[in-house]
């Protein structure tokens, strides 16, 4: 690490109240791929992106959230738990936690990402949080993650259970489809129907030209949401 990079890493440790045994691990968790690529082009072959840590962090997060759900809601149906798990592990919630930590200001971004507002982009913040979880897990152990974030995630889960945070089926579906098929779902308006005097829009949600579900609504947006909900519930049911 350069002196500037080391200072940033030290500042985040103070923010977290955690002293890492391996500061390089935390540094890597903060390195976006755009920064790692720029540094490699400049001859710094040892600078790695946070993508592998993000991969591990995704699994750590899933265990962390599932453990809370299992312990706090023993009577809940598996399908309901899966829905809440997807909501609390969504890009939107993880980005909120990252903003609370002010994680964006500690990230190492390439010049292009910096110019286009990468420090505030939900996807970058969510990915960085997962990478941070992995770094904490490897360096400090699972208990440290519980100490730092259990209360916060329990609060989000409770709000989702109560409907205070609305579940975004389109986002949840996109995350599943992107992860499994490496392509986003496509929403296609196939026709309109008459329901008495009311006009209904009919939308299909497709992945690789295969129809997952059909939704209906008084607006195209409402029909897309209905299709996303049906497709999401179908995919969750297939997994459980």
From Swiss-Prot:
Chief subcellular location: cytoplasm
Keywords: Cytoplasm, Endonuclease, Hydrolase, Magnesium, Metal-binding, mRNA processing, Nuclease, RNA-binding, rRNA processing, rRNA-binding, tRNA processing
Annotated DRBM domain residues: 168-237
InterPro entries in alphabetical order: dsRBD_dom (IPR014720), RNase_III (IPR011907), RNase_III_dom (IPR000999), RNase_III_sf (IPR036389)
A GO MF term: metal ion binding
UniProt keyword annotation of rRNA processing present: yes
Annotated Mg(2+) binding sites: 54, 127, 130
Similarity field: Belongs to the ribonuclease III family.
Subunit: Homodimer.
Full protein name: Ribonuclease 3
Name of the gene: rnc
């Amino acid at each position: 690490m350069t002196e500037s990079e080391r200072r940033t890493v030290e500042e985040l440790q103070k923010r977290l109240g955690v002293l890492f045994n391996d500061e390089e691990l935390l540094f890597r968790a903060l390195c976006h791929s755009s920064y790692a690529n720029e540094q490699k082009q400049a001859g710094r072959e040892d600078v790695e992106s946070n993508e592998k840590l993000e991969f591990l962090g995704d699994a750590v997060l899933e265990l962390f959230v599932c453990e809370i759900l299992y312990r706090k809601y023993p009577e809940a149906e598996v399908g309901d738990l899966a829905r809440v798990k997807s909501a609390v592990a969504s890009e939107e919630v993880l980005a909120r936690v990252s903003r609370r930590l002010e994680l964006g200001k500690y990230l190492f971004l390439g010049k292009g990402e910096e110019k286009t507002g990468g420090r505030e982009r939900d996807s970058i913040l969510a990915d960085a949080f997962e990478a941070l979880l992995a770094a904490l897990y490897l360096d400090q152990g699972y208990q440290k993650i519980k100490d730092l974030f259990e209360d916060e995630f329990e609060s989000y889960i409770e709000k989702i259970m109560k409907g205070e945070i609305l579940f975004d089926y389109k986002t949840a579906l996109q995350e599943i489809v992107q992860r499994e098929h490496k392509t986003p779902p496509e929403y296609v308006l196939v026709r309109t129907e008459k329901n008495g005097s009311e006009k209904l829009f009919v939308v299909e949600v497709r992945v690789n030209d295969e129809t997952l579900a059909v939704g209906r609504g008084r607006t195209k947006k409402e029909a897309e949401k209905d299709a996303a909900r049906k497709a999401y519930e179908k995919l969750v049911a297939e997994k459980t």
